[in-house]
Curated annotation (Swiss-Prot):
<dbReference type="InterPro" id="IPR038136">
    <property type="entry name" value="CofD-like_dom_sf"/>
</dbReference>
<dbReference type="InterPro" id="IPR002882">
    <property type="entry name" value="CofD"/>
</dbReference>
<protein>
    <recommendedName>
        <fullName>Putative gluconeogenesis factor</fullName>
    </recommendedName>
</protein>
<dbReference type="GO" id="GO:0043743">
    <property type="term" value="F:LPPG:FO 2-phospho-L-lactate transferase activity"/>
</dbReference>
<comment type="similarity">
    <text>Belongs to the gluconeogenesis factor family.</text>
</comment>
<comment type="function">
    <text>Required for morphogenesis under gluconeogenic growth conditions.</text>
</comment>
<dbReference type="GO" id="GO:0005737">
    <property type="term" value="C:cytoplasm"/>
</dbReference>
<dbReference type="Pfam" id="PF01933">
    <property type="entry name" value="CofD"/>
</dbReference>
<keyword id="KW-0963">Cytoplasm</keyword>
<dbReference type="InterPro" id="IPR010119">
    <property type="entry name" value="Gluconeogen_factor"/>
</dbReference>
<dbReference type="GO" id="GO:0008360">
    <property type="term" value="P:regulation of cell shape"/>
</dbReference>
Amino acid sequence: MSNPKVVVIGGGTGIPVVLKALRKEKIDLTAIVTVADDGGSSGRIRSAVNIAPPGDLRNVLIAMSDMPKFYADILQYRFDKSDGELAGHPLGNLIIAAVSEMQGSTYRAIQTLAQFFHVEGKIYPSSDAALTLHAVFKDGHEVLGESHIASYKGLIDHVYLTQTASGDSPVASKNVVKSIMEADTIVLGPGSLFTSILPNIVIPEICEALWKTSAKIVYVCNIMTQRGETEHFSDADHVRVLNEHIGTKVIDTVLVNIQEVPEEYMNTNKFDEYLVQVDHDFEALKAEEVNVISNNFLELRDGGAFHNGEAVAKEIVAISQRQEFRH
């Protein structure tokens, strides 16, 4: 019997935690990673070199590799603010940019680097071109650029993408749709709802594949609400927004953390984008027609509240070995 095929879709700092745990399991693992980041080092590189932003891809490469910690630390090394043009760039971002330019494609660069770093699984950027994220707010205002969305401080109605260079509709990378169609289980998140997960899903080919796939679709619900994105959101609100963007109720299962976050770990000075713990609304979740798995998925570290990758991975593997939740 072949290993279950698990596809994880997202970006940011959320999915690397889960991918690092999943790569140790007996599964066929694939990561599909957002390329809509336009802030910080990634934003500067995509403007200078005209490639898909490397930051989220760098974190996923490291999470899925068996490289020693010292090698990972080298890739994560961020140049000091006194280092002129290099200031703020992680070395790994510059390496991805260089290989992307050499090979004329971020997709090809990631495949090369995945071999080089002994990645266990497959990594695909959701698109091979840099994308611009558009957020349309409830008041009709529209904000362009992932890094600018939270600062508007309005209620987001929906998001969509365009290719940064041409303004055209985005196109999925090679093998992305195939991976979704052949998957046994698809995992969305964890991560920022509007700026890490949805920038993959609203690529038309990916959205259509999520409609058509026979895979079980699992959403790992965020533990904390996020400033400028999901303020006052319940767990059901997160699921509802995902289903609305896809166009139908495709989420089969949601993983919900029920462990309380201690007050002292809601550190808005250190983690200023996170606000309070996500409220539970089990009646509304029932209306979204999802199977709810409630458990302690909480890990307290670095002064903040995060997902415990091992606990999440355990549930994902268990779901992948069952058939009853296939939609």
